[in-house]
């Protein structure tokens, strides 16, 4: 899967994207757990997960060929 990082998470990880090889589908929760294990420095950061440009729930599945984006909260006025 391709993972896209934005804003603060992009700055912390010092990369805009990476490819992660999945052998099988994962739930969004499993993906987040994997990400936090790999990058503990983002464990307390808030973000929403979008899969193939659609926001998803933690129980939804991510397939090995999906594009996943970590979208930070948006503030505005």
Curated annotation (Swiss-Prot):
Coiled coil: none annotated. It comes from the Bacteria. The keyword Transmembrane does not apply. Pfam families: ThiS. The modification Glycyl adenylate is found at residue 77. One of its GO terms (cellular component) is molybdopterin adenylyltransferase complex. InterPro entries: Beta-grasp_dom_sf, MOCS2A, Mopterin_synth/thiamin_S_b, ThiS/MoaD-like. The modification 1-thioglycine is found at residue 77. Keywords: Molybdenum cofactor biosynthesis, Nucleotide-binding, Phosphoprotein. GO terms for biological process: Mo-molybdopterin cofactor biosynthetic process. One of its GO terms (molecular function) is nucleotide binding. C-terminal thiocarboxylation occurs in 2 steps, it is first acyl-adenylated (-COAMP) by MoeB, then thiocarboxylated (-COSH) by IscS. Pathway: Cofactor biosynthesis; molybdopterin biosynthesis. Heterotetramer of 2 MoaD subunits and 2 MoaE subunits. Forms a stable heterotetrameric complex of 2 MoaD and 2 MoeB during adenylation of MoaD by MoeB. During catalysis MoaD shuttles between the two heterotetrameric complexes. Involved in sulfur transfer in the conversion of molybdopterin precursor Z to molybdopterin. Belongs to the MoaD family. PANTHER family: MOLYBDOPTERIN SYNTHASE SULFUR CARRIER SUBUNIT. This is Molybdopterin synthase sulfur carrier subunit. It comes from Staphylococcus aureus (strain N315). The gene is moaD.
